[in-house]
């Protein structure tokens, strides 16, 4: 059999194929176990199972020292020795000290290459989150060395291989979320330098994103890494600056072209507005981000806040962002004017956007409270009941202390300052819209009685 295959000496597969051909006389329902990888097929012949079990044994072999190998396994061994990591072990480290950071970066590079036996049991997915503690379970399974040999196709050193593997993953990413995840892994692994070709391709990939609600998390993570992640060496990295600028540009494009978000995307939609506003506010305060035009972004926000056919949520969010940027035309009066232009059903959505982005500028202004109270008084009973759920939900953006301040100002507006603030914050045993509906029914009943001459005011 070896001679037929052109082998000078019989190889292991020659011996196994010869034994199988000699012992098995019936057709096989599954391929030979040594012809594929993974779990043995359930229909494998019992003779083959016995053969594998007998020949496999309990020992672990080693490649002969003269066996040609790629340089990656040796480099990994050197990196593990340099950082004092031994396998097997259970390792607890802290990324906020130099030794722990070096160990964490080596282990994260191995995890990027999907090397068996390298499992992180505890730790944050972001470099800037948490207390920096990580717990790893390190083993040396039989498949580990083979996986290192296969991973050598990405590079000769651990750093190069992990970087090239991440580049391949980012090019295969299905959206901005996957790209952000890869860049978070790069930060954990201390990989800040990537090829210029990747930067150009990432810009094209991000320009294909079509979901505004997906941009918030990406903006938040990318901006934090670009501006603050000095520990991992990602602060000001070119890869982050390129992707961040492309993401901001795409977000601005989407916020002017998207429609009304559905219920499932409502909070993610607002999160995107908040993340965008946070970055624009920092640019307004003097942060330099080449490639992003603050004046163009402000002009877009002005257009969006005044667009009659735009969703009320976006109009409110755009005006709230302008207030955060201290735009001269964005004020409490402008917010009241916009609310007056909208239908009662849209007022709650607009208030959502306003308070989500500019609650400090609005909730504590007596002029806005007085004007908003006047706006509510002009609504009919039916319109008020329909708008009440959205209006109450919008107030949920105020934290407890700010709700107390708002309640105090509402009492002062109605000249009821002698009442405690808790009078407006007492929990109700039924929904407020139900109370308003019952009050409406009561007024209708009294009007009917008065019409019949039974009741007189």
Which residues does each predicted region cover?
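Extended repeat-based interaction scaffolds and adjacent low-complexity, acidic/S/T/P-biased segments
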Residues: 5-457
């Amino acid at each position: 059999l070896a001679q037929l295959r052109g082998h000078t000496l019989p190889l292991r597969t020659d011996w196994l194929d010869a034994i199988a051909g000699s012992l098995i006389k019936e057709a096989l329902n599954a391929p030979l176990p040594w012809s594929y990888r993974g779990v043995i097929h359930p229909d494998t012949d019992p003779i083959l199972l016995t053969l594998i079990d007998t020949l496999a044994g309990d020992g672990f072999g080693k490649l002969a020292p003269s066996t040609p190998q790629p340089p990656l396994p040796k480099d990994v061994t050197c990196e593990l020795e340099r950082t004092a990591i031994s396998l097997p072990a259970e390792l607890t480290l802290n990324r906020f000290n130099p030794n722990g950071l070096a160990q964490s970066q080596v282990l994260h590079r191995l995890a990027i290459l999907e090397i068996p036996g390298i499992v992180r049991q505890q730790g944050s997915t972001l470099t800037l989150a948490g207390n920096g503690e990580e717990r790893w379970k390190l083993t040396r399974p039989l498949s580990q060395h083979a996986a290192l040999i296969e991973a050598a196709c990405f590079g000769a050193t651990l750093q190069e291989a992990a970087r090239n593997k991440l580049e391949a993953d980012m090019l295969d990413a299905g959206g901005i979320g996957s790209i952000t995840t890869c860049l978070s892994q790069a930060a954990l692994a201390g990989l800040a330098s990537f090829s210029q070709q990747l930067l150009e391709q990432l810009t094209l990939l991000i320009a294909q994103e079509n979901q505004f609600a997906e941009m918030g998390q990406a903006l938040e993570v990318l901006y934090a890494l670009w501006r603050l992640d000095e520990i991992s060496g990602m602060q000001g990295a070119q890869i982050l600056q390129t992707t961040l600028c492309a993401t901001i540009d795409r977000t601005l494009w989407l916020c002017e072209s998207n429609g009304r978000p559905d219920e499932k995307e409502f909070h993610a939609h607002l999160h995107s507005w908040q993340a965008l506003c946070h970055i624009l506010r920092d640019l307004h305060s003097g942060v330099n981000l080449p490639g992003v035009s603050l004046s163009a972004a402000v002009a877009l926000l002005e257009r969006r806040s005044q667009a009659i056919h735009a969703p009320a949520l976006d109009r409110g969010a755009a005006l709230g962002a302008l207030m955060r940027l201290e735009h001269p035309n964005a004020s409490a009066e402008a917010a009241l004017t916009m609310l007056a232009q909208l239908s009662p059903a849209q007022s709650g959505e607009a208030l959502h956007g306003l308070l989500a982005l500019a609650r400090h500028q609005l909730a504590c202004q007596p002029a806005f409270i007085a004007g908003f109270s006047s706006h509510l008084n002009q609504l009919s009973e039916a319109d008020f009941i329909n708008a009440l759920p959205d209006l109450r939900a919008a107030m949920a953006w105020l934290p407890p202390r700010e709700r107390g301040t708002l309640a105090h100002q509402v009492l002062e507006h109605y000249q009821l300052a002698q009442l405690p603030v808790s009078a407006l914050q007492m929990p109700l045993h039924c929904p407020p819209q139900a109370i308003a509906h019952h009050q409406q029914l009561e007024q209708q009943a009294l009007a009917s009685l008065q019409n019949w001459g039974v009741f007189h005011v």
